[in-house]
Amino acid sequence: MQLSVIILNYNVRYFLELCVLSVQNAIQNIDAEIIVIDNNSQDDSCEMMKQRFPNVKLIENKENTGFPKGNNIGVSQAKGEYICILNPDTVVAEDTFTRVLTFAKKQNDLGIIGCKLIDGTGNFLPESKRGVPRPFVAFSKITGLYKIFPQTFGQYYAQHLSENKTGKVDILVGAFMLMKRELYNEIGGFDEN
């Protein structure tokens, strides 16, 4: 199996439904699986999953285990060579996984891949690529210096990369992270402490 898409859910039934629909469309030509971990939602997320998506693996936690442990539980069930950690309020384009996997296979020393994130109104989210918020970096963000002098003070949003450019960044947002499952296991997954 090439890809396992891991979606951790908590009380966002309608977003989850849209997310899973988009993932199903995006993996039609890929040997892939979808694993949904529900963190003890109080809405009808699990019922919806059972009715609408009976072929999707659903793990129902009896307590809210949090982001790190919830995702670790999902990855422990994954069979794909690659895993994608995906937030339930994310909708992916039909070619997302094909393009990202093609890119990943061309890399010699692959770490974690993020992607360009767009909000519900079609605007680019600068959180897609970030720098480490060291004191000076945080200061330039809070004071707005990064907007005035992006090349000098734009490290918070990794503004050395334009929104459509590919490159290395220090931090990826947790909404979409793709990596080899072997790497995830090698680093011990997410820190649960």
Question: Which sequence ranges carry the predicted segments?
Answer:
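Cell-envelope/extracellular polymer assembly enzymes that use nucleotide-activated donors
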Residues: 2-4, 33
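Short aromatic/hydrophobic "clamp" motif used to bind/position activated sugar donors
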Residues: 83
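Glycine-rich, basic loop-to-helix element that forms the pyrophosphate-binding segment
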Residues: 60-78
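Conserved donor NDP-sugar-binding/catalytic core segment of glycosyltransferases
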Residues: 91-128
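A conserved acidic beta->alpha catalytic loop
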Residues: 22, 38-47, 63
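Short, acidic, metal-binding catalytic loop of nucleotide-sugar glycosyltransferases
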Residues: 21-31
